[in-house]
């Protein structure tokens, strides 16, 4: 039996699930009557981690965004993983909206999480390791209590827990 138990906290989005969600969203958009004959596109830029929506009006962009978010939720990707960065005019009188996938644990949120863990007086130690936080303890029960605490923080990130040893 191990004397030290640990897990990692990170903010990751499974890009394969995002691709699958966008494919099902494209199928739904193609089948919907309100998008017949209109420009309605959904594209993923994996490298930059952006989703681009293109349609004829603000209402249609909002409908596209709702479809994409509902498909992402069905694929267990939380809506906090997406923020709309900008809307701008595109060619042909269309509008273009850009959605950013938030999947990095920045230093500000890392510090918030470690401070909350230390303030909770749970017998664990938390260390920031780049884009991850390693939490160690002698008791698995303390680690599970720490997971509950972090889930209750309501951060605007898709928090995931991995490598529970």
Swiss-Prot record:
A Pfam family of this chain: DUF520
InterPro entries the record matches: DUF520, UPF0234-like_C, UPF0234_N, YajQ-like_sf
Position of the signal peptide: none
Molecular function GO terms recorded: nucleotide binding
Alphabetical keyword list: Nucleotide-binding
Keyword Oxidoreductase listed: no
GO cellular component, one term: cytosol
PANTHER family, per database record: UPF0234 PROTEIN YAJQ
HAMAP family from the UniProt entry: YajQ (MF_00632)
Family: Belongs to the YajQ family.
Role: Nucleotide-binding protein.
Protein name: Nucleotide-binding protein Ccon26_01810
Organism listed in the record: Campylobacter concisus (strain 13826)
């Amino acid at each position: 039996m191990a004397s030290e138990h640990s897990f990692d906290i990170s903010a990751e989005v499974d890009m394969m699930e995002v691709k699958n969600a966008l494919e099902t969203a494209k199928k739904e958009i193609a089948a919907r009557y309100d998008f017949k004959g209109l420009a309605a596109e959904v594209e993923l830029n994996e490298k930059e981690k952006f989703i681009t929506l293109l349609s004829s009006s603000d209402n249609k962009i909002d409908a596209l965004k709702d479809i994409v978010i509902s498909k992402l939720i069905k694929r267990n990707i939380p809506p906090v993983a997406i923020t709309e960065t900008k809307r701008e005019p595109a060619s042909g009188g269309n509008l273009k909206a850009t959605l950013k996938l938030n999947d990095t644990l920045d230093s500000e949120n890392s510090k918030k999480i470690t401070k909350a863990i230390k303030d909770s007086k749970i017998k664990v130690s938390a260390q920031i390791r780049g884009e991850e936080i390693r939490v160690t303890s002698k008791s698995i029960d303390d680690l599970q209590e720490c997971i509950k605490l972090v889930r209750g923080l309501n951060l605007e990130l898709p928090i995931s827990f991995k490598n529970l040893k």
